[in-house]
């Protein structure tokens, strides 16, 4: 996982899939965010299903949106 400078990585659980490869993620602390799949995950056809545990990268500027960078097996 290539970490961007200033990005915040948190673990969460996929609550529901949304159109256009977006997902509603519930973080460990209870907050819900909107996240899309990172380019490398999309490139390698990694499937994200409801109830999957994932790592989400959040921008410090907008903590309500993020990018899924890893799916736990």
UniProtKB/Swiss-Prot annotation:
The gene is infA. InterPro entries: NA-bd_OB-fold, RNA-binding_domain_S1_IF1, TIF_IF1. Pfam families: eIF-1a. PANTHER family: TRANSLATION INITIATION FACTOR IF-1, CHLOROPLASTIC. GO terms for molecular function: ribosome binding; rRNA binding; translation initiation factor activity. One of the essential components for the initiation of protein synthesis. Stabilizes the binding of IF-2 and IF-3 on the 30S subunit to which N-formylmethionyl-tRNA(fMet) subsequently binds. Helps modulate mRNA selection, yielding the 30S pre-initiation complex (PIC). Upon addition of the 50S ribosomal subunit IF-1, IF-2 and IF-3 are released leaving the mature 70S translation initiation complex. It comes from the Bacteria. Component of the 30S ribosomal translation pre-initiation complex which assembles on the 30S ribosome in the order IF-2 and IF-3, IF-1 and N-formylmethionyl-tRNA(fMet); mRNA recruitment can occur at any time during PIC assembly. Residues 1-73 form the S1-like domain. The keyword rRNA-binding applies. This is Translation initiation factor IF-1. The keyword Electron transport does not apply. Keywords: Cytoplasm, Initiation factor, Protein biosynthesis, RNA-binding, rRNA-binding. HAMAP family: IF_1. It is found in: Cytoplasm. Belongs to the IF-1 family. Its main location: cytoplasm. One of its GO terms (cellular component) is peptidoglycan-based cell wall.
């Amino acid at each position: 996982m290539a970490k961007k400078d200033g990005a915040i990585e948190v673990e969460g659980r996929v609550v529901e899939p949304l159109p256009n490869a977006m997902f509603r993620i519930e973080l460990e602390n209870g907050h819900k965010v909107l996240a899309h799949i990172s380019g490398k995950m999309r490139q390698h056809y990694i499937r994200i299903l409801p109830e999957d545990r994932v790592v989400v990268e959040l921008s410090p500027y907008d903590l309500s949106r993020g990018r899924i960078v890893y799916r736990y097996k």
